[in-house]
Amino acid sequence: MARLQQFYKETIVSDLVKQFGYKSVMEVPRITKITLNMGVGEAVADKKVLENAVGDMQKIAGQKPVTTKARKSIAGFKIRDGYPIGCMVTLRGPRMFEFLDRLVTIALPRVRDFRGISGKGFDGQGNYNMGVKEQIIFPEIEYDKIDALRGMNISITTTAKTDAEAKALLVAFKFPFKN
């Protein structure tokens, strides 16, 4: 069992029951999945760029990402319907908790000029979205072997009904929010 998963079961659940007054432990919000998405616009000109992005994402997530394809043609961007333009991976279970652990304890503190993550990334349904500007904050990526700095979106989907509950859950997981 992952370290954060055990921490969730042993301490976070009881803390949130006290804080929000849930009648059952099954009402306590939990993280269902984490989705990593990397849009690679340069893949239109060079297919090698997408292969490198997929390799980076695989090292970061620990599982093989799926390539995302363009849904419709856009002449201005020289994209045709069905072109591979990015990659994404969905993490659940123990892998999700391991990634969350690495994100909070190792990767986020390595961001340049880091003062905490924004509290404005909640969507109203208790999910949190954040962006990472460069993939080198993860220790799995070797600085010498990258061809370009690429960012990614990280979506954390929870069972929380409100943003306040979701924020309390993420704060319990030691997320470094600003202020």
UniProtKB/Swiss-Prot annotation:
Superkingdom per UniProt: Bacteria
Cystine pairs: none
Any one GO MF annotation of this record: structural constituent of ribosome
Stored Gene3D superfamilies: 3.30.1440.10
GO biological process: translation
GO cellular component term of the entry, any: ribosome
Pfam families the UniProt entry points to: Ribosomal_L5, Ribosomal_L5_C
Keywords assigned by UniProt, alphabetized: Ribonucleoprotein, Ribosomal protein, RNA-binding, rRNA-binding, tRNA-binding
Classification via InterPro entries: Ribosomal_uL5, Ribosomal_uL5_bac-type, Ribosomal_uL5_C, Ribosomal_uL5_CS, Ribosomal_uL5_dom_sf, Ribosomal_uL5_N
This protein's record includes keyword RNA-binding: yes
Reported function: This is one of the proteins that bind and probably mediate the attachment of the 5S RNA into the large ribosomal subunit, where it forms part of the central protuberance. In the 70S ribosome it contacts protein S13 of the 30S subunit (bridge B1b), connecting the 2 subunits; this bridge is implicated in subunit movement. Contacts the P site tRNA; the 5S rRNA and some of its associated proteins might help stabilize positioning of ribosome-bound tRNAs.
Family according to the record: Belongs to the universal ribosomal protein uL5 family.
SUBUNIT field: Part of the 50S ribosomal subunit; part of the 5S rRNA/L5/L18/L25 subcomplex. Contacts the 5S rRNA and the P site tRNA. Forms a bridge to the 30S subunit in the 70S ribosome.
Classification via NCBIfam families: PRK00010.1 (NF000585)
Protein name as it appears in the record: Large ribosomal subunit protein uL5
Record organism: Dechloromonas aromatica (strain RCB)
